[in-house]
Swiss-Prot record:
Its EC number is 2.8.1.7. The gene is iscS. GO terms for cellular component: L-cysteine desulfurase complex. This is Cysteine desulfurase IscS. Pyridoxal 5'-phosphate binds at residues 75-76, 155, 183, 203-205, 243. It comes from Shewanella piezotolerans (strain WP3 / JCM 13877). It comes from the Bacteria. The modification N6-(pyridoxal phosphate)lysine is found at residue 206. It is found in: Cytoplasm. It is an enzyme of class 2 (transferase).
Amino acid sequence: MKLPIYLDYAATTPVDPRVAEKMMQCMTMDGIFGNPASRSHRYGWQAEEAVDIARNQIAELINADPREIVFTSGATESDNLAIKGVAHFYQKKGKHIITSKTEHKAVLDTCRQLEREGYEVTYLQPEANGLIPVAMIEAAMREDTLLVSIMQVNNEIGVIQDIDAIGELCRSRKIVFHVDAAQSAGKMPIDVQKTKVDLMSISAHKMYGPKGIGALYVSRKPRIRLEAAMHGGGHERGMRSGTLATHQIVGFGEAAAIAKTDMDSDNERIRRLRDKLWNGINHIEETYINGDMEQRHCGSLNVSFNFVEGESLMMALKDLAVSSGSACTSASLEPSYVLRALGLNDEMAHSSIRFSIGRFTTDEEIEHAIETITESIGNLREMSPLWEMFKDGIDLDSVQWAHH
């Protein structure tokens, strides 16, 4: 067993060896190294064919038309292109956007930028379980609403939003619907023909593909128009210029193909391991799960251990690679904005750890994790005066702390 144990699959996944092998065939002189836009010789044609195959594989994963897949550098760029692209193209229709407080920073910061440009954004507060009722979205809609952006699976707490119902609502009101599917694509079935989604952001490195490549699904029926952010050679039907990175795209395609075939067996095993982990630690006193347990991605577990400081717990769990909050914001010592939006106080938000399980997690690793967590929390609480006061029956909320 290799230490530290990797339990941070929501931050990134290792590249599947089958994916790495495919990528290696697209880099060197004896491989498919040409520029896919070179139309005058075989090197370009081979690269273009490799890109086309990958585009098909990614389209099949979400049941889209390959012409609806636009390659980007990742889900952050896809989110930016989708939200800014729609806002700028359809600004005559209105300047109101609806999103939620628990979205990824790539969506929230893009919306903040649009606010600086004169757009109006409504940030919905989810319920305590992390879910956003469709009625709440409907109540926020106005005549000038042009876009709704809601993620499918939350990166911190793993809850799944009802994008089918939200899609129906948006389509009936002729409002563009964007879904950030970075955490769900390749991990759960998605069918863009059934779900009325207009735009969907996808990332390769969350599904055992390489970093630095992603895609934006852009619906053709109804046709969604975007204002491009990257100008140049007119690649990707003018929506995203720049030479296509054949090796990354081929890796992305292979990762999507593997995800499609292995999804059921992967998820069954991952769910079993997640339940094993939760059953192994939920006997610890004052341990709470964050987010809805039913509407939840099978590999995700966000747990608050009361009276334990999250950062000190992370240090104590040096054998486990886990995180507090999302990888993009875990460097700041602010409590997670996602957990604060669920109504957790600062102390509980600070004492939370995200465990995310994936394709290469083993039973042995989960057993070791349970032991380590149980032992570390016991040790940290022994040192905590707050824990001692709590055990003595003192109501900590009623304590008047002196300010020196």
